[in-house]
């Protein structure tokens, strides 16, 4: 098993963890409907980059 040879300081531990934070999803506003959606994803009503690409059922 891997066992550390020397104890790591709080500073080194913090520097290692500095990249672990989660960022929020980037949101865009659809130009045709004004609806918020995730970048590079189809909106819930089926539009992508201003064009209807998916037929959404009205269940």
UniProtKB/Swiss-Prot annotation:
A Pfam family name for this chain? Ribosomal_L32p
Q: Does the keyword tRNA-binding apply?
A: no
InterPro entries listed in its UniProt record: Ribosomal_bL32, Ribosomal_bL32_bact, Ribosomal_zn-bd
Quote the biased-composition stretches of kind Basic residues, using this chain's numbering.
7-16
Record-level GO cellular component terms: large ribosomal subunit
Instruction: Cite the residue spans of the region called Disordered.
Output: 1-59
The entry's keywords: Ribonucleoprotein, Ribosomal protein
Record GO terms (molecular function): structural constituent of ribosome
According to its UniProt entry, one GO biological process term is: translation
Q: Which HAMAP family match?
A: Ribosomal_bL32 (MF_00340)
**What family does this chain come from, according to its entry?**
Belongs to the bacterial ribosomal protein bL32 family.
User: What's the protein called, per UniProt?
Assistant: Large ribosomal subunit protein bL32
The coding gene here is rpmF
